[in-house]
Curated annotation (Swiss-Prot):
Associates with the 50S ribosomal subunit. GTP 2 binds at residues 181-188, 229-233, 294-297. Residues 4-167, 175-351 form the EngA-type G domain. InterPro entries: G_ENGA (IPR031166), GTP-bd (IPR006073), GTPase_Der (IPR016484), KH_dom-like (IPR032859), KH_dom-like_a/b (IPR015946), P-loop_NTPase (IPR027417), Small_GTP-bd (IPR005225). Keywords: GTP-binding, Nucleotide-binding, Repeat, Ribosome biogenesis. This is GTPase Der. Gene3D superfamilies: 3.30.300.20, P-loop containing nucleotide triphosphate hydrolases.
Amino acid sequence: MVLPTVAIVGRPNVGKSTLFNRIAGERISIVEDVEGVTRDRIYATGEWLNRQFSLIDTGGIDDVDAPFMEQIKHQAQIAMEEADVIVFVVSGKEGVTDADEYVSKILYRTNTPVILAVNKVDNPEMRNDIYDFYSLGLGDPYPVSSVHGIGTGDVLDEIVENLPVEEAEENDDIIRFSLIGRPNVGKSSLINAILGEDRVIASPVAGTTRDAIDTHFTDADGQEFTMIDTAGMRKSGKIYENTEKYSVMRAMRAIDRSDVVLMVINAEEGIREYDKRIAGFAHEAGKGMIIVVNKWDTIDKDNHTVAKWEADIRDQFQFLTYAPIIFVSALTKQRLNKLPDLIKRISESQNKRIPSAVLNDVIMDAIAINPTPTDKGKRLKIFYATQVSVKPPTFVVFVNEEELMHFSYLRFLENQIRAAFTFEGTPIHLIARKRK
């Protein structure tokens, strides 16, 4: 199910990131300490009153070298284009500024609900000063101290009140996949080429997210697919259409709806920071992953080229050791016929369930190979493990003390489970929990 999007907008130093972290709370996933996984948090999942939503800090998307007014204009444009609800953050300490008025005039033209959050109202005496913000013409200002958590509940109430009606669950028998990557890596050509391979019916339909185009098709075996085109990719006339900073949000929306994500890399240009950043989002979201190196026909090759590329990819994407790599050409259709079967296998891995008895046999064998660690004379005891969910496969390991489960031993257990059950192309999550 796709989540509605809430965008946080505002000039620098008004506390957007603090409010972002306060709303996201502990739902922000801990990024692995591996080079290549982004640590800047511009995207997280928020939840309030049993409603989940994607939370975007548009300030983290923008180009810091751009002129000041251009930056905040871009933020507002992104929010108006992509978000279901906009939270416009201003500073109660500084009052209304020219930049606030500039943004408010842009936001005033949108039909998207705008919530005006007056941040840094850190004591009751400051609440009397918020009324100046009525001059922005965006409705009631909400006093907030994101540092202390004061007033954030009122903002969250208003966010939930303005979220679109929840959509019905989508058909789970359909495999949904998306192609993500930098502009000009050949996503459009790959989409057209894939639709020319092993299909029975292909029909473009309006997607469930703003400006997305979904294409449904069925392969020769009767498996239904939905290919999620990056939102807005087929639109024209957008001044920021082919710039990386604006494609970030669109890629994240596509990732959110996908079961399997195809990370497309241009063989002519190699791996860039953007590739690692977006791949990190897909990994943290627990999606199935395939690394697709496109335009393979355009580069000179020898007997060592594939091995060199694979080694470089594994080095740059150390958090994607589970993701298969495939070298393709949208132009010549080289290896494209392998993609549907690969997507199906990864979808099966995402939905795989392991019986507890079989799982615990593997855990006990793993302990025999590598005994549990000790800390200050106390040894970790593993009582049993069980699978609690799929997409991605998630396992809970019940232990005597959670603190004794070092991340390296958890990683060892993950590798043993992978070796036993072949979870191709999908992350798996292991959680240590104290047995009660």
